[in-house]
Design a protein with these regions (language model features):
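ATP-dependent carboxylate-amine ligase catalytic core
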Residues: 149
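N-terminal Rossmann-like NAD(P)+-binding domain of SDR-like oxidoreductases, especially those catalyzing
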Residues: 1-145
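Short, intrinsically disordered, charge-balanced linker/junction segments flanking boundaries
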Residues: 25, 152-156
Length: 156
């Protein structure tokens, strides 16, 4: 079984990547540098599973830079889904966010939340149109001992 982890150097992706390696899985990680096109990072080989964590992660940053965040989150996810469809990936596991839920009414309150919701919808669309198996996980208050506590949107 071959596994690809996007955003494998990020907060949650790095933990999963390390655990999969430790457990002996055939895993490869990619990380997108600022402004880099994901197509240049994606390997020209097939994988069974893709865990997609690559994103511009901060709500506060998205409020100040909505179009940049849109490109980094929505366009990257769209490109990855198309790549997965063309490389016979069995399942894409998409890392979404509690920011999609807004204040509990399902209406995002930030560009970051909106972009994650759009990406969830695109995952569903790829499942319906192309038969690509996708799963979206919404994380609430992810925390570890090495987490930073800064920012006005910190909740844990």
């Amino acid at each position: 079984m071959k596994i690809l982890v996007t955003g494998h150097k990020g907060y949650i992706g790095s933990h999963l990547f390390s655990d999969l390696k430790r457990l002996g899985y055939n895993v490869r990680g990619i990380d997108i540098k600022d402004g880099e096109d994901i197509l240049h990072c994606l390997p020209n080989e097939d994988f069974d599973y893709v865990f997609h964590f690559a994103a511009q992660p901060r709500v506060e940053f998205s409020v100040h830079h909505p179009s940049y965040t849109m490109k980094q989150n929505v366009l990257v996810t769209s490109t990855l889904l198309e790549w997965a469809k063309n490389h016979s990936v069995k399942r894409v596991i998409f890392s979404s966010s509690s920011a999609v839920s807004g204040d509990g009414d399902g209406v995002p309150r930030s560009p970051y939340g909106l972009h994650k919701l759009i990406s969830e919808m695109e995952c569903r669309l790829f499942s319906e149109l192309y038969g690509l198996d996708t799963v979206c996980l919404r994380y609430f208050n992810a925390y570890s001992e090495d987490q930073g506590f800064g920012g006005s949107y910190s909740t844990a």
